[in-house]
């Protein structure tokens, strides 16, 4: 998630922001 400034790996590690990171992570996977 370049916009959020948090890498997908970090998102996966942070369960607290799982919702925000999850959406971002999915977008990255779908985008690629």
Swiss-Prot record:
Compartments where located: Secreted
Isoleucine amide, modified sites: 30
Principal localisation: secreted
Cellular component per GO, a single term: extracellular region
Tissue specificity comment: Expressed by the venom duct.
UniProt modification remark: Contains 2 disulfide bonds.
Keywords: Amidation, Disulfide bond, Neurotoxin, Secreted, Toxin
Single annotated GO MF: toxin activity
Comment, domains: The cysteine framework is XIV (C-C-C-C).
Name of the molecule in the record: Turripeptide XIV-18
Species, as recorded: Gemmula speciosa
